UniProtKB/Swiss-Prot annotation:
This is Pyridoxine 5'-phosphate synthase. GO terms for molecular function: pyridoxine 5'-phosphate synthase activity. Keywords: Cytoplasm, Pyridoxine biosynthesis, Transferase. The record marks E153 as: Transition state stabilizer. It comes from the Bacteria. The keyword Transferase applies. The gene is pdxJ. Belongs to the PNP synthase family. Homooctamer; tetramer of dimers. The active site is at H45, E72, H193. 1-deoxy-D-xylulose 5-phosphate binds at D11, H12, R47, H52, T102.
Length: 248
């Protein structure tokens, strides 16, 4: 059975801190607690506008984390220099718009292949694995392969927002086909965005998906049940769904 891994996104711990400009809650402490509760990696998005995660968070987590870091960032020169300094195990390149509340869609890899080819190469030379956050689109998957990224993260936001059962089924099939294509090209497939306790199972049941990156839902649930329980419950749902997929 292919295992399924949980990456906890700690951005919204930092969002709460920045709302009052305090020193608490500490996203790095949240990361360490989540690791103890079963999170397999920690995801954090250092945005250009620094609206939640700050540079100091990235550097502190780099020194203290027990699992691995997945640093989400825009493909800019500034972010490249930071990634080269802190050397996260993984970098996930994402699109950014200053006016958006959260990442609204996948990266357009096909339109910037030359830039991303060089960008991915520099990170690879620094022993950082590169992931590209893209929509479940054949052209973008082929482009990801061409620029040298070994991993893609499929944007599940569209799936997460749907309520009509037929539309959900169609979107799941699109994600499955995209996953199959990526695997056939030798890419590792992760997924994330908008996943929560009531919709994660269908994505976790796609056997070829290796990791799910989830943040908002877990941090929200932590208000009521505590972070360790929120993390362990999400991990349990994911693992159960993966096991059921193999049992048929």
């Amino acid at each position: 059975m292919n295992p399924i891994f949980l990456g906890l996104n700690i951005d919204h711990v930092a969002t709460l801190r920045q709302a009052r400009g305090t020193r608490y809650p500490d996203p790095v402490k949240a990361a360490l607690d989540a690791e103890m509760a079963g999170a397999d990696s920690i995801t954090l998005h250092l945005r250009e506008d620094r609206r939640h995660i700050q540079d100091a968070d990235v550097y502190r987590l780099s020194e203290l984390r027990q699992t691995k870091i997945n640093l989400e960032m825009a493909a800019t020169q500034e972010m490249l220099e930071i990634a080269l300094k802190c050397q996260p195990e993984d970098v996930c390149l994402v699109p950014e718009k200053r006016e958006e509340l959260t990442t609204e869609g996948g990266l357009d890899v096909a339109s910037q292949k030359a830039w991303l080819t060089d960008y991915c190469a520099q990170l690879a030379e620094n022993k950082t694995r590169v992931s590209l956050f893209i929509d479940a689109d054949d052209a973008q998957i082929h482009a990801a392969k061409e620029v040298g990224a070994p991993v893609i993260e499929i944007h599940t936001g569209t799936y997460a927002e749907l309520t009509d059962p037929a539309a959900i089924k169609t979107e799941l099939e699109r994600i499955r086909k995209a996953t199959d294509l990526a695997v056939s090209l030798g890419l590792t497939v992760n997924a994330g965005h908008g996943l929560h306790y009531h919709n994660v199972q269908a994505i976790a049941a796609i056997k070829e998906i290796e990791e799910l990156n989830i943040g908002h839902a877990i941090i929200a649930q932590a208000i009521f049940s505590g972070l360790p329980d929120a993390v362990s419950e999400m991990k349990r749902l994911m693992v159960d769904a993966r096991q059921q997929a193999y049992l048929g």
